[in-house]
Amino acid sequence: MEQKKLMFHCENIGMQFPGTLALQGVDLDIYEGEIVGLVGENGAGKSTLLKIILGMQTPTYGSMLMHGERYAPQNPKEANRQGVGMVFQEQSLITNLTVGQNIFFGEEKRFAAGPLINYQAMYREAQAVLDTVGLKDVKPGKKVSDLDFATRQMVEIAKVLQGVTNHKNGKSLILLDEPTSVLN
């Protein structure tokens, strides 16, 4: 039997806010291919832990490893470069942009053809990501404002998947903070 490889490890993670201990001594191992759920009451620290893993908050104490290397992202962009992304319950899509522009927001230089953006190439790559999440009928050139709420949330998931796929270790960790609570 093949032994699963450890992808993510956190040890003794703690988070203290003024007057509040949000997390205390959290240990967590996530192996490649594994699906892990964090269950607890409101205020138990689940979202705080996810924000620490994504680099949105710095733990008061503890350490993390990703693919066996020290992991301490300072922001979500740095976490993405190391293969970690997060889909939030609240949507962050820019409604006056197209689906493809949202999926590749901040990465437009990849599609630059001189001073112009090659939207055809961008939309081709965006369609491949949309297909992956079951949105074959959603066209990358469509305005986000024309999508229903549930489809927008699936575009959020596609955006995160696209953002974490090009890193050195090839395996990604996708964090989900109640992203499907609004879906059909």
Q: What residue spans do the PLM features occupy?
A:
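Glycine-rich phosphate-binding loops of nucleotide-dependent enzymes
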Residues: 2-184
